[in-house]
Each structure stands twice: as C-alpha cells, then as structure tokens.
Amino acid sequence: MLFRSVKVAVRYNPNPARITEPLYKVEELEKSPLYTVLCGGKELTVYHTDSFDYVIPVVDDDSPLSFQVKVSKDFQKAVFRPAKTNVQAQISGRELSFQLEKPSKVTLELDGNLKTPLFILCTKRVPKPEKVDHLFESGKVYNVGTLEVKAEETVFLEEGSVVCGCVNAFFAHGMRILGNGILNGCVWHPKEENGGGRPMIRMVFCDDVKIQGITMVDGGSWHLVPGACWNVEIEDVNIMSRVCTGDGIDIVGCEDVTMRNSFIRASDDCVCIKAASYPDPAANRRSEERRVGKECRSRWS
C-alpha cells in the first residue's frame, strides 16, 4: 500500500512564542496603509490589523457628518453596510465623499474584499465623571496586565488613550468602565494564537454595571464577559476580534442585561447567551430575566 505525505496548512501556531515587548507609545499602533479618512475636513487616525482597518470619530451630538475617504489603490466598487443606512457616496478616482445623516457605525467594503473592510465607528463622547478611580489619559499607552476593579469604582479611558491588558471584577457592584479610549489586546497574545489568554473584560457576581463608549480590539479570547451578573448596561461599545475564539459579548447566567448602539466584529460568536453552574445565592429569587439588544451592529467574518 502506498502512502502519500500530505501537508496540512495550520492557521494558528499551537505553541506560539510569547510576546516580551509591550507597547510604549500610541504612535506604535499600526496605521492603515490603505485608507485615509477625513471628517468635517479633519484627518482622523485610521488603525490597521491584518483583518480590518478602523476609525473612531468621537462626536458630541447627532448632527450630520461629512466624510472623505482616500484609498491608496484603485477599486471598482464600494459598498456600505448595513444597507439600511443608505449611504450614497460620490466617487472620484480613488476618493469617496459621503454624508451620514446622523452619527452611526458603518462598514465600507471595496470590490467585495472581506479582508480589507474599513469600520467607521461613530461614538458619542463620554464625559469624565467627577469620581474616577482608574484614569487613563489621552495620548498615553498603559500596560496594565490585569486591572482589578472593586465595587463602586470607575475606570475612565480618555479619547486617544490605549490600555493594553485586561479587566477583572469580582463582586464589584456599581462598577463603571467609561470613556472613548481603546482597550487593545494585540501585545499580550501572539497574533496567530487561537483560544489563548483571558477575557478582556471579565465580571463575575456584579450588580449595577455600566460599560460605555470604549473600543475593544484584538483580544486573545472572549472580549466582554459578564458572568452571574445582573443589571448590566452595555452602550455604544465597539468590539473587533481577529482570533477564531474571539467572541464579542458572552452573557453567562445573567439577569437584566441591556445592549444598545454597539458594534461587534467577531470571527466566532458576536453575542452569545450562555448558562453556567455558578453557585448564585440569588438563584431562587423570583425575577423577570431580560436581555435586550437595541440598535446594535454585528459582523461575523
């Protein structure tokens, strides 16, 4: 009997080398070589990964927005999603001009190429509250490892800040994670790793939780995970993952969870509601369980 050796392409390295060099400056985050974006005539930073590019216009109100997108290579067709936004672009050579009647989260695809989308993720400005326990300032990079959040604490990411690491909360009633900065996982898991690392935000046994305005990018595993929590509000959050197990939001054994006006790009589950055997002392309490999603956008790739 004749056997042939067959080479199998492995997408992910099962034993990747660990990353030893953290990010030191915001400028070190890779910028898009394909897209330049202007909003109201002002150039915005367009970030790049090997799976998508993204830009985060932070806005103060619901006024219309005018955009110009300059593309560094020729293209034949441009499509905006979701289709119901009905974006009508004027195309001149490699440049597109269009207007959003109100701030929204849209995707630009060129020539049907799903590997080079541009995510335009308009996000409302989140004002800094008077009480902030963990402040991450604009223009700075923070390598936090695991940030432990306690009850009644507020985490605030200013626009232009980049936080590398993950957030963990246990019995952190009244916790808040707010702002318009970026929680980025690219430097604490290897690019080709699948299923490695910890959830980017993990909350267990927490009540009265609010996550608003932040952008989460390229975690090594699940991104936003409330477990055995109740009264959770997720608003205007952007989540973009690359790895195969990079779920967007996993709601595990929770009560009264509301998601609104958020964007999720995932290679696995965008939003997944799960059950788990948490020893919840409130398990026998009579309660109406609600999980509500309003004006959210999801994209599976």
Q: Could you tell me what each predicted segment is?
A:
Residues 1-2, 293-296:
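Short, small-residue-biased leader/transition segments that mark boundaries at the very start
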Residues 136, 149, 155-158, 176-179, ...:
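All-beta strand scaffolds that present successive hydrophobic residues in beta-strands
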Residues 3-131:
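Beta-strand-enriched, solvent-exposed domains that form extended recognition/catalytic surfaces
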Residues 228, 238, 253-255, 275-277:
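Active-site-proximal loop/turn and secondary-structure-junction residues that shape catalytic pockets
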Residues 96-98, 141-154, 162-178, 186-209, ...:
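Extracellular beta-strand-rich solenoid/capping regions of secreted or surface-exposed proteins
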Residues 124-147:
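An acidic-aromatic substrate-binding cleft motif
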Residues 144-146, 164-168, 186-191, 219-226, ...:
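Short glycine/acidic-rich loop motifs that flank beta-strands on beta-rich extracellular proteins
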Residues 159, 181-182, 187, 215, ...:
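A structural signal for beta-strand register positions
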